[in-house]
Amino acid sequence: ELTESSEELYYPILDRIHESLHEKYIEGLYKKKIEQFDAKDDNLTLVQQYIYLTKWVSKDLDDEALNNIRKVFELMKAQGYKAILRFAYNHAGLNTSGGESKQWILRHIEQLTPLLNEYIGQIATVQVGFIGAWGEWHTSPLANDQDAKNAIVSALLRALPVPYCVEMRYPSHKKALTLEQEEYRGRIGYANDYFTAGEHSHAPGNDFVPNTDDYKQITGEVKANNFYMSGEIPYNEDTEWGLAALITPMKSLRILREHRYSAFDITQNFDLNIMSWKQVKVYPSLLNDNNILFDESYFKDAEGNEVVRSFYEFVRDHLGYRLNLQSESTVEAKNGNLEYNLTITNTGFATVINPKEVYLVLVSGDGQVAKEIKLDVDPKTWIPSTNEEPNQVAKYVIKGSAAAGLSGTYKVGIWMPEKVADLKYNPAYAIKF
């Protein structure tokens, strides 16, 4: 029989965790944030991890630095998290200088490369930080050094294995780059650190405002390359740059879909916009009217009864990918072979960005996996809809036959583990349907 999990995959950003490498790490590093932002039932799987190299700004990363970074990854692994990483030197903020230089940033990327590759299965993306206050590319001796920026982005792209992505802040930053390997440009996504749905007075030039050249550029790029996109709302502050007003939920939803967001911060503006999203209800008719894709099963419980969803829940559950095994899928045993004809849809905002393998597995009555059958498919191609039919959910058919090599009665399932060997059999890092 063909079985499918009812679990859901959630990919919001858990929190901005700012840590200097000389600080002590504790086992409850992320648990406290889960409790602080009322997310115990959200099954969050992603954290934005800042790592400050302040102490080493003009010298080699020593064993202390590298071992502490390793501790961060091991803590994340123990709790089943992946990370959006950002390295920086200046955590003091504006009107200060971290003293960073092209020479030492390139040296540090060189030193970090083996470690990044060792833990690549726990990395969602790496933001191109290093320069400026909080790694935001301002308030820096390198602010106007384009040669340094070219070299740093090129080095970081080389450090990560293809097809893993990096993120930059603005399309203008990306346009200005001269890369050492131009073919890597499609691996540069964006981190929208000022998501306001274009509704703040400072949105132009800071947010990606609908109908602007920047917005159109990102829309075209993400369709062509399916790179990583993430965002965060400004803090709820009655200041020039704060956001002390509610932004329009459906407009936000359309942006998340059009720019194929994979992650979103739930901590900034938590007490205003995020809490409001938890109260606003979303209905199938409203989504249909706005051409937002979804699977009908999302609005039903296990018994088939209709359920009401909040805007927060819908965003939480559709960031990145949301894979659905369709009811017409079949798996049959014939003459010692397993014949499969599977139909999968993806109603998430984006797709499976980083490498995953796809298997059929035969599961015995006692719950043990008796056989793994690897399928020759690339889930990154499972985009939610095609350019030809942008408002229709695309269907992906996986059809074939494989020698079962077993006799008896088994359940059949789809297994999509992390490709990296040390995480392959860690269920926390497998895709859930």
Question: How would you label these PLM feature ranges?
Answer:
Residues 253-328:
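Catalytic cores of secreted or luminal carbohydrate-active enzymes
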Residues 30-90, 103, 160:
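Aromatic-lined substrate-binding rim segments of carbohydrate-active enzymes
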Residues 56-59, 92-97, 134-138, 175-178:
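Extracytoplasmic/secreted cell-surface and envelope-processing proteins
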Residues 8, 44-48, 80-84, 123-127, ...:
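Structural preference for beta-strand elements that scaffold enzyme active sites
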Residues 1-45, 50:
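Boundary/entry segment of secreted carbohydrate-active catalytic domains
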Residues 313-433:
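Extracellular/luminal regions of secreted and cell-surface proteins that mediate adhesion/ECM remodeling
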Residues 125-132, 136, 140-281:
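Catalytic-core regions of glycoside hydrolase
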Residues 64-82, 98-127, 147-159:
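An active-site-proximal structural segment forming one wall of the substrate-binding cleft
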